[in-house]
């Protein structure tokens, strides 16, 4: 297998934006990474099995806790990119953390090959070989490439269905270029590309590259448990056949006609994984209204004169989502610039007028003369149809006219729109415009004579909601597109959910119940039919613009009431790690129904009971996580060609054996597998299953991940249902969408080559943790290289020079540092446990190093303590092992001289003692002091320039006096009590009216600034700070003692000759100034008067005075 390896220079030209100037440090780190990757491979560091002790599983797990993490196996039609790595990192970080907690961690990965993408690409290559030969010698005139963007409209416009927005990173673009050029962009030499015309060659080429890239990335994967999907692997093939047989036998898989997105070119349904664009788009069901043409205008008669329309019923077909509004039709709209066709329908002597696109859909929905055949008799411009007289089914106005509408789309619906201006803001705005400018549009006013008819009564918008909303939103014309879109959504929701019919036989009924009845009536009377088309544009992997077809097919009956109920139960028990993901599941369960589970083209497993079909790729990938637990015992290679440790042959894995292993059925009577082997299979499954976390992109919630829940509930006992599913957002790069065409793109292999594995991992950890778009910053990855290199050198230097460090009892700064280490251990543990890796990285890397730097600075005059330096290094190594395992392993073994790998003997660090709040508060106080002192100096100089305050020259030797207080002014206590009385903790709000009315008017000037400041301190307090702790006004430490301890540091840091501390003893009153005692300074013990501007000092908020002193 050969790949074209770019040089470092080529890599930096090809990928993203950042060019590395000096790579010595990076190269050193990469050299270490290669060393330890080889070591882990030789030591089989990540290979893990269930314990062999013969005790019940629950006892076994208690004695040997386990953790099983995984992600959807990547598709093998290319190299992994940073988006894959981002999701992989979520599993990697979680499992690495659990390994440090002493658990037996299983992290496997398979290779997905099922479906049509590989076959479609192979077929394209075959055609290109026919065109250009195996060397792909393209004539110069054909070399030009054209880039087009495929835009997918918002998925579902019907508000009765779930809809989701695509993020910035999710928008897909399709490049019109040759497949062999795509292969070259993947690093495949042109001389080898012809081999990929054989679909199965892909299966041998990309899996090894995937494993290489993951290994270079430092992932802790048990590669023994890898496999490829499809019938190429007979063991996995047997597993999938067992799975679908169970679903079929239990009635979960059914056969029948259903509407599905379909590729005419491929001749089969086009499921999510078969699409180049339009993932998540499904069929949109309309009611096709037959508006029989009663009289054509002169222009239309001329255009159609070559077509024999005698004895023919010609119907303009209007597709509507709101059949209940047909009572109020006043006219019909066409796009004047759209070309319409006249097509033979499935009814003899009946012709349809609609767009060609709609006719393509109808031809595969039993609405044409012959399935799959569009019988077009002729075409006509929309302009020529204006003025036609048509029948309006159910309408109060039986016969209406055709009018122009510029906003009618040829790519949506049928191109014909029936107008109901009472309830459609678009229709109302257009009709109003046409009436105003009838002469301009060359329209006969007679064509617009019908007034809007009240159809639906709504509580918010009355009986004519379209007119109401157009006035409310100040819509002046059809060109107010934004406001009309808003009005349309508001009208639809209000009418459907709150509206009541006020006309017709269903008058008095809620719209929700009347809508299907009106629709049925129209269809039963032959006035309408069911019509489907894709909700948005769907482009297949083969480049086909897909339609919706009515197909006889095997489908999974997702949404069936009892199955849905038990799946909802599984969701209730599932840890989704965020409310957005749970809501995504709930919405999917609301709309998800029948899903085609078979196809006729592609790679995969044959349906056991109907082998002409293959199991589709979102069906064979729902419970394979269970297969991970035992596959290393079945086969020793990913293709299943070599039997595994138990020497079991594929044909021995009968349905009864699978049942015994996965469903605890009785031991098969006729199996040739030994009892010991069966017991081993059962033990591996029962010990590791269910999985604890499955990380995935959020785009899989509406399909794969929900299917995963459904299938688990159908096949497994409750105790084996999934425990956790974590979804992440898409990954941007340098703040922009990843795109090969712009160069803002990077494969995983390129990233580890450019930055090294550990630096790449750190940048991915920092990228983000929510379901929103995350961002990989190259600059951060680059800075991580320097940080790791520098820290390694510092750790080595310290451990080699321990004798130069201080020993003996801990002083104040030692205790504060030790406490901060403990605090960061706890915050890191909390973040890791919640899979909040950006927060974990901040605590265990940035904050921990800042803590060390601070400690080094405050102890500069007395040196750091030897024991604490050693503890910090070991803590840093263990905490960072999750993110930077190679770096940590190196220091663990070579600097700390540990005898075993960190993956074997390393454990998440424990606190040396509970976190001391007083020490934490002291540290926060100290770190704030330097900043506040500098601000005070600047403020004093500013006042001095205005002629206020004591003269002071900052360039000369200076003394700083710090004024502190032990008690709050007595007058403030009553207002603190008042604020506490009128504080609502659940809403984090104060009753301002009650507070103001309780304050004496004479006290307003003094009280209100204090009240406002105190309110803000309560409202804006930290997440882990209670309101009571603010109201208590307790510092939690002795301010005077802390100041004494940090005095040497402040003298150095602030650059002063002397630090003087004055304690406020007696507050000022009307007859005398405030009095203070000098606690520290050249005049210690003296009693001094305190100037008024310093007399308002309160505990925790000292005030400062700078003075010049003689050198």
Curated annotation (Swiss-Prot):
Spell out the CDD domains in the cross-references.
Anticodon_Ia_Leu_AEc, LeuRS_core
Residues engaged in binding ATP: 740
Entry's Gene Ontology molecular function annotations: aminoacyl-tRNA deacylase activity; ATP binding; leucine-tRNA ligase activity
Any Gene Ontology CC annotation: cytosol
Q: Identify the domain of life.
A: Eukaryota
The Enzyme Commission number assigned here is 6.1.1.4
Specify the signal sequence span. none
Main location class: cytoplasm
Compartments it resides in:
Cytoplasm
Catalytic activity as recorded in UniProt: tRNA(Leu) + L-leucine + ATP = L-leucyl-tRNA(Leu) + AMP + diphosphate
The record's top EC class is ligase
**Where can the motif 'HIGH' region be found?**
74-84
InterPro entries, per the entry = aa-tRNA-synth_Ia, Leu-tRNA-synth_Ia_arc/euk, M/V/L/I-tRNA-synth_anticd-bd, RBD_LARS1, Rossmann-like_a/b/a_fold, tRNAsynth_Ia_anticodon-bd, Val/Leu/Ile-tRNA-synth_edit
Modification Phosphoserine, positions: 460
Q: What UniProt keywords are attached to this protein's entry?
A: Aminoacyl-tRNA synthetase, ATP-binding, Cytoplasm, Ligase, Nucleotide-binding, Phosphoprotein, Protein biosynthesis
Q: Where does the motif 'KMSKS' region lie?
A: 737-741
- One Gene Ontology term from the biological process aspect of the record: leucyl-tRNA aminoacylation
Q: Which family does it belong to?
A: Belongs to the class-I aminoacyl-tRNA synthetase family.
Q: Protein name, please? A: Putative leucine--tRNA ligase, cytoplasmic
Q: Which organism is it from?
A: Schizosaccharomyces pombe (strain 972 / ATCC 24843)
């Amino acid at each position: 297998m050969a790949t074209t390896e770019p040089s470092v220079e080529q890599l930096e030209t090809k990928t993203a934006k950042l060019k590395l100037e000096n790579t010595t440090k990076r190269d050193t780190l990469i050299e270490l990474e290669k060393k330890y990757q080889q070591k882990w491979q030789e030591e089989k560091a990540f290979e893990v099995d269930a314990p062999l002790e013969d005790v019940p599983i629950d006892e076994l797990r208690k004695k040997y806790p386990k953790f099983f993490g995984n992600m959807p196996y990547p598709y093998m039609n290319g190299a992994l990119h940073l988006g894959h790595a981002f999701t992989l990192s979520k599993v990697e970080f979680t499992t690495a953390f659990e390994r440090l907690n002493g658990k037996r961690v299983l992290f496997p990965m398979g290779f997905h090959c099922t479906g049509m993408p590989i076959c479609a690409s192979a077929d394209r290559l075959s055609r290109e070989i026919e065109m250009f030969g195996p060397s792909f010698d393209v004539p110069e005139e054909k070399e030009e490439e054209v880039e087009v963007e495929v835009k997918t409209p918002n998925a579902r416009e019907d508000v009765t269905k779930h809809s989701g927005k695509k993020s910035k990173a999710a928008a897909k673009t399709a490049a019109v270029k040759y497949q062999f050029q795509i292969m070259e962009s993947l690093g495949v030499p042109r001389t080898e590309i012809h081999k990929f015309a054989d679909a199965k060659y892909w299966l041998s080429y990309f899996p090894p590259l995937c494993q290489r890239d993951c290994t270079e990335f430092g992932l802790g994967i048990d590669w023994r448990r890898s496999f490829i999907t499809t019938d190429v692997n007979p063991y996995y093939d047997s597993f999938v056949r067992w799975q679908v047989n169970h679903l079929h036998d239990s009635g979960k898989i059914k056969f029948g006609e259903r509407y599905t997105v379909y590729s005419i070119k491929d001749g089969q349904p086009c499921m999510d994984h078969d699409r180049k664009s339009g993932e998540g788009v499904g069929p949109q069901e309309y009611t096709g209204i037959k508006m029989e043409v009663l009289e054509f205008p002169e222009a239309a008669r001329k255009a159609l004169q070559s077509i024999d329309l005698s004895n023919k019923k010609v119907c303009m077909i209007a597709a509507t989502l709101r059949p209940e509004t047909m009572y109020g039709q006043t006219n019909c709209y066409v796009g004047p610039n759209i070309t319409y066709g006249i097509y033979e329908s499935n009814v003899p002597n009946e012709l349809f007028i609609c767009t060609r696109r709609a006719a393509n859909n109808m031809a595969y929905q039993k609405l044409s003369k012959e399935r799959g055949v569009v019988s077009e008799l002729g075409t006509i411009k929309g302009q020529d149809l204006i003025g036609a007289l048509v029948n309006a089914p159910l309408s109060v106005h039986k016969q209406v006219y055709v009018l122009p509408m510029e906003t009618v789309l040829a790519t949506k619906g049928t191109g014909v729109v029936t107008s109901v201006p009472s309830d459609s803001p678009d229709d109302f705005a257009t009709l109003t415009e046409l009436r105003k400018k009838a002469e301009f549009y060359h329209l006969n006013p007679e064509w617009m004579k019908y007034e809007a008819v009240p159809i639906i009564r709504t509580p918010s918008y009355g009986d004519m909601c379209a007119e109401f909303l157009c006035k409310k939103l100040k819509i002046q014309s059809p060109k107010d597109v934004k406001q009309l879109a808003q009005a349309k959504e508001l009208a639809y929701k209000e009418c459907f959910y709150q509206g009541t019919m006020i006309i017709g036989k269903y008058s008095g009924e809620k719209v929700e119940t009347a809508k299907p009845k009106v629709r049925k009536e129209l269809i039963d009377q032959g006035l309408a039919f069911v019509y489907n088309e894709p909700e948005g544009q769907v482009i297949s992997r083969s480049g086909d613009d897909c339609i919706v077809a009515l197909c006889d097919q095997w489908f999974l009956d997702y949404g069936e009431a009892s199955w849905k109920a038990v799946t909802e139960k599984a969701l209730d028990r599932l840890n989704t790690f965020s409310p957005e993901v749970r809501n995504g599941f709930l919405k999917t369960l609301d709309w998800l129904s029948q899903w085609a589970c078979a196809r006729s083209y592609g790679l995969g497993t044959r349906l056991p009971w109907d082998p002409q079909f293959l199991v589709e790729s979102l069906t064979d990938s729902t419970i394979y996580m269970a297969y991970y637990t035992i596959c290393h015992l079945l086969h020793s290679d990913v293709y299943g060609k070599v039997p595994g440790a138990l020497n079991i042959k594929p044909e021995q894995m009968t349905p009864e054996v699978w049942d015994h292993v996965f469903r605890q059925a009785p031991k098969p009577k006729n199996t040739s597998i030994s009892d010991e082997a069966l017991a081993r299979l059962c033990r591996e499954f029962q010990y590791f299953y269910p999985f604890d976390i499955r990380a995935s992109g959020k785009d899989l919630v509406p399909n794969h991940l929900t299917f995963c829940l459904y299938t688990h509930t159908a096949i497994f006992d409750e105790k084996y249902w999934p425990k956790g599913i974590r979804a992440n957002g898409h990954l941007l790069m340098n703040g922009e969408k990843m795109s090969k065409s712009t160069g803002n793109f990077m494969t995983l292999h390129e990233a580890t080559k450019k930055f090294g594995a550990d630096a790449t991992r750190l940048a991915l950890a920092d990228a983000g943790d929510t379901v929103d778009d995350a961002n990989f910053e190259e600059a951060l990855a680059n800075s991580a290289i320097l940080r790791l290199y520098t820290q390694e050198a510092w750790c080595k230097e310290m451990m080699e020079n321990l004798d130069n460090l201080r020993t003996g009892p801990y002083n104040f700064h030692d205790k504060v540092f030790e406490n901060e280490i403990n605090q960061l251990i706890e915050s890191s543990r909390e973040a890791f446990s919640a899979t909040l890796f950006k927060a974990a990285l901040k605590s265990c890397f940035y904050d921990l190093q800042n803590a060390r730097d601070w400690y080094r600075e405050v102890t500069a005059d007395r040196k750091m303590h030897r024991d604490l330096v050693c503890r910090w290094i070991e803590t840093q190594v263990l905490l960072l092992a999750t993110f930077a395992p190679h770096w940590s392993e190196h220091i663990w073994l070579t600097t700390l001289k540990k005898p075993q790998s960190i993956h074997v003997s390393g454990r998440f660090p424990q606190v040396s003692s509970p976190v001391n709040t007083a020490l934490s508060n002291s540290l926060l106080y100290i770190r704030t002091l330097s900043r506040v002192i500098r601000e005070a100096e600047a403020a004093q100089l500013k006042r001095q320039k205005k002629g206020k305050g004591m003269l002071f020259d900052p360039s000369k030797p200076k003394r700083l006096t710090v004024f502190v207080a032990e008690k709050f002014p007595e007058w403030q206590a009553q207002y603190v009590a008042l604020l506490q009385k009128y504080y609502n903790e659940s809403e984090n709000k104060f009753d301002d009216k009650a507070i103001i009315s309780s304050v004496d008017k004479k006290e307003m000037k003094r009280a209100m600034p204090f009240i406002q400041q105190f309110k803000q301190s309560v409202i804006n307090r930290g997440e882990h700070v209670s309101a009571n702790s603010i109201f208590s006004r307790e510092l939690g430490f002795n301010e005077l003692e802390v100041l004494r301890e940090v005095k040497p540091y402040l003298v150095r840091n602030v650059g002063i000759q002397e630090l003087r501390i004055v304690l406020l003893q007696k507050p000022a009153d009307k007859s005398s100034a405030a009095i203070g005692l000098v606690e520290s300074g050249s005049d210690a013990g003296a009693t001094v008067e305190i100037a008024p501007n310093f007399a308002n000092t309160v505990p925790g908020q000292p005030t400062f005075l700078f003075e010049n002193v003689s050198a």
